[in-house]
Amino acid sequence: MLRIADKTFQSRLFTGTGKFASSSLMLEAIRESGSEMATLAMKRVDLLRRDDALLAPLQASGVALLPNTSGAKTAEEAVFAAQLAREALGTHWIKLEIHPDARWLLPDPIETLRAAEKLVAQGFVVLPYCGADPVLCKRLEEAGCAAVMPLGAPIGSNQGLQTRALLEIIIAQASVPVVVDAGIGAPSHAAEALEMGADAVLVNTAIAVARDPVAMARAFRQAVEAGRTGFEAGLGARVFQAQATSPLTGFLEAQA
């Protein structure tokens, strides 16, 4: 069971809603993934229409929505987007995203921390997307963020856990849940993150652009479950030298 702020989750797989060929395919993939929370970019939603093609089916599905501030380039823009989301969707949960460079979509650490401090003061449950920076993640935690969401690799790159060494430090020192976000391109990447001790992963592109998104969503669900089970079971220590699984007993000499 995963607890973040005032919510508990059975699934440790969170999903995104972008890049799917259709809303129906998106919903089917989310259902197959077992995910209980999906992110939603406020910039993609027409809040003036109750039958918005993206928002309406998501609300009807019962999955918890995590609006994000994608598109914001400054703390002020992110705070405004969060306030808009709270007013329109009736949620105080927000995924904080501030990436000023559209080419790389890397999070701005200074603006992210500034926005996080303001949003926490306004009563938001803040889940910040951030670089795999252990110092920044600790500062965000100290600012009152309910979780931290460090990247594994650039958004949509499918490169996997390129920041593994830093993620290990973040996980080791965190007192709030760590959700690995961005760059996860294969079920094996998700399993690796959970085996390391990450509390959850957020996956969008790898599912949405797969040849069969529904089957890929199922694969990610199974990978996350396997990774968490492996972590809880206790992985064996990695060693440099070979260690025999069947110690010598001298029986060969005894037969001579």
Curated annotation (Swiss-Prot):
Keywords on record: Cytoplasm, Schiff base, Thiamine biosynthesis, Transferase
Binding positions (1-deoxy-D-xylulose 5-phosphate): G156, A182, G183, N204, T205
Residues at the catalytic site: K95
GO biological process: one example: thiamine diphosphate biosynthetic process
Function: Catalyzes the rearrangement of 1-deoxy-D-xylulose 5-phosphate (DXP) to produce the thiazole phosphate moiety of thiamine. Sulfur is provided by the thiocarboxylate moiety of the carrier protein ThiS. In vitro, sulfur can be provided by H(2)S.
The family this protein is said to belong to: Belongs to the ThiG family.
Protein name per its UniProtKB record: Thiazole synthase
Originating organism: Cronobacter sakazakii (strain ATCC BAA-894)
